[in-house]
């Protein structure tokens, strides 16, 4: 599995701000979107381009355009919505597929409760977004759904990832690509990433 920890100074700085204990909902939400945008920039660096001729201000001009690769952004509800706008800043024509999976607080197992995928998802590259890759259960379950629907070009974008989640994802889906702003130390006894970001969903939606 291709694993990319984005080490750009802007990414590291913004993620550091997100780790502050007393950060406001507004600021956390803004930074989640901004880091999501920067991760998208990295994840789409290998998209193929082609030369096309357009009418420029001085006549015909040859330019580069993305070559036919359709994209669907797949936020995992609910926290993934906090990164979606940042992703769409880079790929505004992408279609949106939504998957609802939550983690049972006692068993730590993923529980699916909603999915709405674009009709031609088998023709698209999926950018799956979720702030945290902890145990990996929710992400694995989401990718299971995408592959069952015929989508096999999948990239995962997360703000922080635990080594345990990375290992689980690689074992279940070695063909996907992972882009993260940080690979953190690991999980605590409750299954939360340390040092992590706390409960990203609560911080994004102001329910902390």
Curated annotation (Swiss-Prot):
The enzyme's E.C. designation: 2.4.2.9
Activity regulation note: Allosterically activated by GTP.
Cofactor binding: number and manner: Binds 1 Mg(2+) ion per subunit. The magnesium is bound as Mg-PRPP.
Keywords, comma-separated and alphabetical: Allosteric enzyme, Glycosyltransferase, GTP-binding, Magnesium, Nucleotide-binding, Transferase
GO biological process, one term: uracil salvage
UniProt xrefs under InterPro entries: PRibTrfase_dom, PRTase-like, Upp_B, UPRTase/APRTase, Ura_phspho_trans
Catalytic activity: UMP + diphosphate = 5-phospho-alpha-D-ribose 1-diphosphate + uracil
Protein's pathway: Pyrimidine metabolism; UMP biosynthesis via salvage pathway; UMP from uracil: step 1/1
Binding site for uracil: 193, 198-200
GO molecular-function term, one example from the UniProt record: magnesium ion binding
Classification via HAMAP family: Upp_B
Entry's family note: Belongs to the UPRTase family.
Name assigned to this protein: Uracil phosphoribosyltransferase
Gene that encodes the chain: upp
């Amino acid at each position: 599995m291709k694993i990319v920890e984005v080490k750009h100074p802007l990414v590291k700085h913004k993620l550091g701000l997100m780790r502050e204990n007393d950060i406001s909902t507004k600021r956390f939400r803004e930074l989640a979107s901004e880091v999501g945008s920067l991760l998208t920039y990295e994840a789409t660096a290998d998209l193929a381009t082609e030369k096309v001729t357009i009418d420029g201000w001085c006549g015909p001009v040859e330019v580069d355009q993305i070559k036919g690769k359709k994209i669907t952004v797949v936020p995992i509800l609910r926290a993934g919505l906090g990164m979606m706008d940042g992703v769409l800043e880079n790929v505004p024509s992408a279609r949106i597929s939504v998957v609802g999976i939550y983690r049972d607080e006692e068993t730590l197992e993923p529980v699916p409760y909603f999915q709405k995928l674009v009709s031609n998802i088998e023709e698209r590259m999926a950018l799956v977004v979720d702030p945290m890759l902890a145990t990996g259960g929710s992400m694995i379950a989401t990718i299971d759904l995408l592959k069952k629907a015929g989508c096999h070009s999948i990239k995962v974008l997360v703000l922080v990832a635990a080594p345990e989640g990375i290992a689980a994802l690689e074992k279940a889906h070695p063909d996907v690509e992972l882009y993260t702003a940080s690979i953190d130390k690991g999980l605590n006894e409750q299954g939360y990433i340390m040092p992590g970001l706390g409960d990203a969903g609560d911080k994004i939606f102001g329910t902390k």
